[in-house]
């Protein structure tokens, strides 16, 4: 064996090594400069540890071979283990917790799951655009800070259904971000200092511990919040909490869950915000590129809403982002170590335990790969026709192999959307045209001090932008198109042909594609179907029917459920596959050029060599540039179906049409529970919107169309038949160990409002028939006490009984709450059901006048979602949360309910003045009053004076229907007097904090209207009514019921 070369590098000093060769504020830049001096491989000594750096594509290609090298956790990343322990990013190679978490979480980051997150990503992108639009073109924007807010809010919302609302808070960053920035910087610094120096930095160590504790506490609070308030959503947080490792059957411990939440919150936003910041820096430095990018967005999207389907049609945006990440990889290195002694580059010996850092800022500018202009920003080099020709492992900003970034697809989709949204909406300019790029370093990099100004395009105003985005419909989900039905009768499906589908799928994508293909094949007459993982096909490939394989490559290897199948094919002992007819559809991602479609190609070739008959050419879908379902449909129509027609449909003389599924005979009837209530009619939701800003109690507006005319008048009510919140239903199911689809049948019951002798699912029973949140009664407490074997629990329940009003009724403690608290209670489900009242209708005031929009109603309501008075979790209002869950097209059941006769408008609105007083959602009936007055005015009739006194928190918070009321004021329909409790001095609040203060300020006007026979109306809480009445009696004397009419809720 020839002698190995010594690895060059600056000469280290005793104890401190090469510490003095590094600028500790810009250590990365110091190391990059060394690459120019010492070549493609060099080493330095820091903290008594040798660090080897590789800077050429040729060396990186070797280091990415996972049969020779694996990830090493050292330096700053190792210091982060104090924070993230054995999370996905900081776990050592082979660490057990990493394996469990990785296998559980992989499906959560599959392409289809990522596409499902698009709507939430779009929500946060809109918030960014609204902020910039409302700030105006004169505002200086710290682009890195705003992108940090965006990416943190996005990862929290998309993966944990958790809103941080960074754009609605103060100018300071979220506490998690503040702690994160400190920890990242300190970990980087500690990795550069000798341990003796770190030991004497006591204050820094204490601060580090404090920030770590704060971050883990925030993650713990997220877990507690979800457990206290379960949500039936298919998000990452539920996967973390409830997922099970398919290999060991284990779930994740709370410590491991916290570590991975922190990992996602950091890794899921810090590098992406840097990518976006550098991308816009380069765009503003290159006006021609900026113009071409904007033109692409305008041509593909126009001025309409951006959809997930648009992203695959923006290749130049994709190339710009890749080029930006090439020049400025925001995670600037990853580290590997050999599994056994390895010779690198043919001349350097690397031993196990020695770590080699892939120095991406230099590797990705390798002139041997990218040419003499490798340091220049030239996006065309990253267009697909050029990118696909790059040597293997030339572009590795997301790391390598199984330890590469699990959230890469998430980050890329988010960044594409944001770049497209900003280009579509704004013209950007750098605040300082002479700005020279400075890089801020922690363990990641981003521009330092780069600021821009944003001007809305197309002459839009901020208000117009808001209306445009709010009116945009929800994006369609992938693969949702219907297949055209032919004219073959569905009865022909009986005795249909057989077909087998096998899939290899880690993330669930190929499994979903196989299911979709099976579904469409059902309509083509292949009704005898078998669908299973590829491993089940070992020694089990059928020969009397077509076999369709849908699979992908996972980090160069087969998926977990296809490993045995591929090993079988490669073993050399496969029996002849003569008689097997098959076709392969492969999925891949072009950025993994070395392994693109590797496994689908290998399976296709090995089966063919073993004697199987290839039905048609292999289908392929590139997840980077296309919609997988669309590619599958094209391959099905143009390749697979003709092949199946030729080989398996001879009996039909070539006629191979889809079954007409529309000839299925079905009937639809109203839910059983609707028939148990009188006078309910069907309504269809046509609009729903939030009326308040984040940070204040939520109020919503829902509008629905009814199927028949009613005698409703302004001021009347409607009864709504609700369902219980899903999280409350899940609690009940869990307490009685029931699945949602368990069937319950009442063989006999004294309750006439429960379905008799009719099977009903457990979820429907708890959701639609029972008052799960009803406070427990005294008798309930006695019954529960009699069923517990615990003397301690029995005494506690009896204590509750003796102090019923204060401990149960006033705190709204339900039977379900008690069952969750006293786990010793063994209550039969039948007894539980008998304890609960039947779910009742909820009553709301109309907020739309029938004359204003015939056959339509609207409600204005507060969404009750607040900490439970019992101190256990949150209390969810049944009716309001049901209404808040509706979307346009939803069906609800309502019945009209007249208000008391006095709570209506005067018969003669021309001569009788009115004064309306309310706060918050108490505005509802008065909105219908005002709309009816508008209809009266439009008929050419004169109107008597009307005053509306309205109390809320503030003009940008919960000033309900502000613009609409302003229009009515301009028309002379009403005069509005507001009181702002949070900003009383804001015009036009005139210093009045509450409604009664505003009434007092208008004493003269009110007395004059009272003298002209005005009627006073009030709608609100008992507290409001008490304060208002006292104020009015001080100025008007005794109030008669005929002229002072109240509705208290």
UniProtKB/Swiss-Prot annotation:
Catalytic activity: 2 oxidized [cytochrome P450] + NADPH = 2 reduced [cytochrome P450] + NADP(+) + H(+); an organic molecule + reduced [NADPH--hemoprotein reductase] + O2 = an alcohol + oxidized [NADPH--hemoprotein reductase] + H2O + H(+); dodecanoate + reduced [NADPH--hemoprotein reductase] + O2 = 5-hydroxydodecanoate + oxidized [NADPH--hemoprotein reductase] + H2O + H(+); tetradecanoate + reduced [NADPH--hemoprotein reductase] + O2 = 7-hydroxytetradecanoate + oxidized [NADPH--hemoprotein reductase] + H2O + H(+)
Name of the protein this chain belongs to: Self-sufficient cytochrome P450 monooxygenase CYP505E4
Function as written in the Swiss-Prot or TrEMBL entry: Self-sufficient cytochrome P450 monooxygenase that catalyzes the regioselective in-chain hydroxylation of alkanes, fatty alcohols, and fatty acids at the omega-7 position. Performs hydroxylation of C10-C16 n-alkanes and C12 and C14 fatty alcohols; and thereby enables the one step biocatalytic synthesis of rare alcohols such as 5-dodecanol and 7-tetradecanol. Converts 1-dodecanol into 1,5-dodecanediol as major product with very little sub-terminally hydroxylated products with the 1,4-dodecanediol and 1,6-dodecanediol more abundant.
Residues the record lists as binding heme: 405
Domain Flavodoxin-like: 499-640
UniProt-annotated binding residues for FMN: 505-509, 584-616
InterPro entries cross-referenced by the UniProt entry: Bifunctional_P450_P450_red (IPR023206), CysJ-like_FAD-binding (IPR003097), Cyt_P450 (IPR001128), Cyt_P450_CS (IPR017972), Cyt_P450_E_grp-I (IPR002401), Cyt_P450_sf (IPR036396), FAD-bd_FR_type (IPR017927), Flavodoxin/NO_synth (IPR008254)
Cofactor or coenzyme needed: FAD; FMN; heme
Coiled coil regions in record: none
């Amino acid at each position: 064996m020839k002698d190995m070369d010594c690895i060059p590098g600056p000469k280290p000093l005793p104890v401190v090594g090469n510490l003095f060769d590094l600028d500790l504020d810009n250590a990365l830049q110091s190391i990059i400069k060394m690459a120019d001096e010492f070549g493609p491989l060099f080493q330095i000594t820091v903290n008594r540890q040798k660090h080897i750096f590789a800077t050429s594509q040729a060396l990186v290609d070797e280091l990415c071979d996972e049969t020779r090298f694996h990830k090493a956790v050292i330096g700053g990343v190792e210091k982060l283990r104090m924070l993230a322990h054995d999370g996905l990013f900081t776990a050592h190679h082979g660490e057990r917790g990493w394996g469990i978490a990785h296998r559980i979480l992989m499906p959560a980051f599959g392409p289809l799951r990522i596409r499902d997150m698009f709507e939430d990503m779009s929500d946060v992108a809109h918030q960014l655009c609204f902020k910039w639009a409302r700030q105006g073109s004169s505002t200086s924007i710290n682009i890195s800070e705003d992108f940090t807010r965006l990416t943190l809010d996005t990862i929290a919302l998309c993966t944990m259904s958790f809103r941080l609302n960074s754009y609605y808070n103060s100018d300071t960053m979220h506490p998690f971000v503040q702690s994160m920035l400190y920890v990242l910087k300190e970990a980087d610094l500690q990795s550069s200092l000798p341990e003796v120096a770190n030991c004497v930095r006591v204050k820094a160590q204490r601060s580090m511990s404090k920030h770590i504790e704060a971050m883990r506490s925030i993650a713990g609070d997220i877990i507690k919040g979800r457990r206290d308030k379960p949500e039936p959503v298919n998000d990452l947080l539920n996967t973390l909490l409830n997922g099970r490792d398919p290999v060991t059957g284990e779930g994740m411990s709370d410590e491991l869950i916290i570590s991975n939440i922190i990992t996602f919150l950091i890794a899921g936003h810090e590098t992406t915000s840097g990518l976006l910041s550098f991308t816009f820096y380069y765009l503003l430095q290159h006006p021609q590129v900026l113009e071409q990018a904007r033109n692409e967005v305008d041509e593909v999207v126009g001025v309409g809403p951006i959809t997930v389907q648009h992203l695959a049609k923006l290749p130049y945006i994709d190339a710009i982002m890749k080029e930006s990440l090439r020049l400025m990889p925001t995670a600037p290195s990853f580290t590997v170590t050999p599994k056994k002694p390895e010779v690198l580059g043919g001349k350097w010996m690397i031993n196990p335990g020695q770590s080699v850092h892939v120095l991406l800022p230099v590797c990705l500018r390798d002139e041997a790969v990218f040419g003499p202009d490798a340091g220049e920003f030239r996006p065309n080099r990253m267009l697909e026709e050029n990118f696909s020709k790059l040597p293997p492992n030339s572009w590795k900003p997301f790391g390598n192999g199984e330890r590469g970034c699990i959230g890469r697809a998430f980050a890329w989709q988010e960044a594409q959307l944001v770049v497209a949204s900003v280009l579509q909406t704004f013209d950007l300019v750098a605040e300082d045209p002479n700005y020279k790029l400075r890089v801020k370093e922690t363990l990641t990099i981003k521009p330092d001090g780069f600021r821009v100004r944003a001007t809305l395009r197309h002459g839009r105003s901020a208000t117009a932008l808001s209306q445009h985005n709010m009116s945009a419909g929800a994006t369609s989900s992938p693969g949702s198109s219907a297949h055209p039905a032919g004219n073959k009768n569905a009865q022909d499906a009986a005795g249909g042909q057989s077909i087998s589908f096998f899939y290899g799928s880690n993330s669930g994508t190929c499994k979903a594609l196989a299911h979709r293909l099976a579904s469409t094949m059902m309509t083509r007459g292949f009704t005898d179907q078998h669908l299973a993982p590829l491993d089940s096909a070992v020694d089990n490939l059928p020969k009397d029917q077509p076999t369709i394989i849908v699979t992908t490559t996972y980090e160069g290897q087969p998926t977990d459920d296809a490993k045995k199948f591929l090993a079988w094919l490669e073993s050399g002992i496969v029996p002849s596959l003569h008689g097997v007819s098959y076709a392969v559809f492969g999925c891949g991602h072009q950025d993994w050029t070395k392994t693109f479609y590797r496994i689908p190609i290998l399976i296709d070739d090995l089966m063919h060599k073993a004697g199987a008959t290839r039905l048609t050419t292999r289908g392929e879908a590139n997840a980077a540039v296309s919609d997988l379902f669309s590619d599958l449909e094209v391959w099905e129509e143009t390749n697979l179906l003709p092949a199946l027609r030729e080989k398996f449909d001879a009996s039909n003389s070539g006629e191979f049409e889809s079954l007409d599924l529309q000839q299925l005979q079905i009937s639809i009837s109203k839910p059983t529970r609707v028939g148990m209530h009188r006078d309910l009619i069907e309504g269809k939701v046509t609009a729903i919107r939030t009326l308040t800003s984040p940070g204040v109690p939520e109020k919503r507006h829902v509008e629905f169309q009814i199927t028949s005319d009613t005698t409703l008048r302004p001021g009347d009510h409607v009864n709504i038949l609700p369902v219980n919140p899903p999280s409350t239903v899940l609690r009940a199911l869990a307490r009685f160990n029931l699945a949602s689809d368990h069937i319950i049948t009442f063989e006999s019951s004294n309750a006439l409002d429960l379905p008799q002798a009719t099977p009903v699912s457990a979820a429907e029973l708890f959701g639609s028939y029972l008052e799960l949140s009803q406070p427990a009664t005294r008798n309930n407490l006695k019954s529960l006490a009699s069923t517990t074997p615990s003397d301690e629990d029995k005494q506690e329940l009896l204590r509750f009984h003796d102090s019923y009003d204060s401990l149960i009724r006033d705190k709204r403690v339900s039977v379900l709450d008690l069952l969750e608290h006293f786990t010793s209670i063994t209550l039969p489900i039948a007894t539980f059901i008998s304890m609960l009242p039947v779910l009742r209708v909820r009553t709301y005031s109309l907020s739309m006048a029938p004359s204003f929009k015939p056959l339509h109603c609207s409600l204005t309501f507060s969404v009750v979602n607040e900490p439970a008075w019992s101190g256990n979790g949150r209390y969810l209002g049944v009716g309001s949360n049901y209404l808040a869950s509706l979307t346009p097209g939803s069906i609800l059941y309502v019945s009209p309910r007249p208000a008391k006769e006095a709570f209506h408008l005067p018969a003669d609105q021309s001569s009788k003045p009115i004064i309306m007083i309310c706060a918050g959602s108490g505005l509802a009936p008065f909105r219908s009053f005002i709309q009816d007055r508008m209809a009266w005015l439009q008929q050419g009739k004169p109107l008597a004076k009307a005053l509306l006194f309205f109390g809320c928190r503030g003009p940008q918070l919960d000033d309900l229907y502000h613009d609409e009321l302003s229009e009515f004021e301009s028309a002379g329909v009403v005069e509005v007097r507001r009181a702002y409790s949070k900003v009383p001095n804001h015009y036009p609040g005139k210093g009045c904090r509450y409604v009664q203060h505003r009434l007092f300020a208008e004493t003269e006007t009110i007395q004059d209207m009272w003298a002209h026979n005005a009627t006073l109306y009030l709608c609100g809480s008992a507290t409001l009514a008490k304060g208002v009445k006292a104020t009015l009696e001080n100025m008007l004397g005794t109030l008669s019921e005929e002229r002072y009419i109240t509705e208290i809720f």
